[in-house]
């Protein structure tokens, strides 16, 4: 299946199960689908081979997910070595990856996956507290149960504390011993990005100038490398979020990026703007284009947002 065909296939699945979707055709981007349903917001990278997903893309995807309180997910068909299986969760750089079939089961049938593919085999997470209660109820010591399972006493202690995943074989033995399900579902919507850096390091002289000016008016800037925009600009007190593009001058690529920013801003409930070194003030695809001199004259975040809203209203 070709890259574009696969993205469209995943988008059709999402729409079938009630999601509003946006497909972004931006080569090299950290995501190519945005999906919303009720209060749920997903940033999805759909690609047939999940090993083509880079660490840089993963870091950007985590930043976006953290800023927008969204869930990042990879959807794929294979790795470079093997086909992915339905019902199993894979991981790349801290982001969960599933097949289209697993995605459908999660949201259409309410069946979360239970098995995690890790180096060395398949693993599950078990209810450690329930395991300890059952062990004590049946009168097993740590050593006795560990011997039955074929694991060390220390490993069994980690299982009971919930500090370690369990091989599929051990989990099946546990359920045979106690005749009770102990496996906990994997929450694919909860990626591991608590410690992600919201860095604002600029890559160009123009980016540095724009970032510094935005920071001087009280805004925070988070650099994003693999998206249609260069940064997310925020102001927490007034809950301002701006998808911010930066270019030297207006080109066809700028216009295409502005269109994508406009579409994304609408679906995530934010605003967008482009700052160009050389440009006239205008609105393209509902996204204001501002020359850098405008930023130099702005006194605070509220005034910037006021300019953006006035330009959009004048255009409509």
UniProtKB/Swiss-Prot annotation:
SMART domains found in the cross-reference section: HTH_XRE (SM00530)
> Residues of the signal sequence?
none
Limits of the HTH cro/C1-type domain: 131-189
What positions does the DNA-binding region cover?
142-161
Asked whether the keyword Transcription regulation is assigned, the reply is yes
Q: Name the InterPro entries for this protein.
A: Arc_TR_HTH, Cro/C1-type_HTH, Lambda_DNA-bd_dom_sf
Task: Give the SUPFAM superfamilies listed for this entry.
Answer: lambda repressor-like DNA-binding domains
Keywords, in A-Z order = DNA-binding, Transcription, Transcription regulation
State one molecular function term (GO): DNA-binding transcription factor activity
Q: What is this protein called?
A: Putative HTH-type transcriptional regulatory protein PYRAB03670
């Amino acid at each position: 299946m070709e890259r574009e065909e696969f993205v469209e296939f995943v988008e059709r699945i999402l729409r079938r199960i009630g999601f509003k979707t946006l497909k972004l055709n931006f080569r090299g981007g950290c995501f190519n689908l945005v999906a919303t349903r009720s209060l749920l917001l997903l940033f999805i990278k759909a690609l047939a081979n999940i090993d083509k997903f880079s660490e840089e893309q993963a870091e950007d995807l985590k930043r976006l997910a953290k800023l927008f309180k969204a869930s990042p997910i990879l959807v794929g068909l294979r790795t470079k070595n093997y086909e992915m299986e339905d019902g199993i969760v894979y991981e790349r750089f801290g982001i969960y990856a599933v097949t289209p079939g697993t995605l459908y089961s999660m949201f259409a049938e309410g069946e979360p996956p239970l098995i995690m593919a890790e180096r060395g085999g398949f693993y599950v997470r078990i209810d450690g507290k329930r395991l300890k209660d059952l062990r004590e109820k049946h009168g097993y010591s740590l050593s006795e149960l560990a011997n039955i399972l074929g694991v060390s006493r220390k490993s069994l202690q980690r299982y009971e504390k919930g500090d370690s995943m369990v091989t599929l074989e051990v989990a099946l033995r546990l359920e045979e011993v106690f005749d009770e399900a102990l496996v906990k579902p994997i929450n694919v919507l909860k990626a591991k990005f608590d410690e992600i850096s919201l860095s604002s390091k600029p890559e160009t002289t123009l980016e540095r100038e724009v970032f510094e000016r935005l920071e001087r008016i009280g805004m925070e800037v988070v650099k994003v490398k693999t998206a249609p925009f260069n940064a997310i600009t925020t102001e927490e007190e007034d809950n301002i979020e701006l998808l911010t593009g930066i270019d030297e001058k207006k080109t066809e690529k700028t216009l295409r990026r502005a269109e994508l920013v406009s579409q994304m801003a609408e679906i995530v409930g934010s605003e967008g703007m482009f700052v160009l070194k050389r440009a006239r003030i205008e609105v393209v695809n509902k996204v204001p284009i501002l020359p850098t001199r405008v930023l130099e004259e702005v006194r605070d975040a509220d005034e910037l947002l006021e300019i953006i809203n006035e330009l959009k209203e004048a255009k409509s």
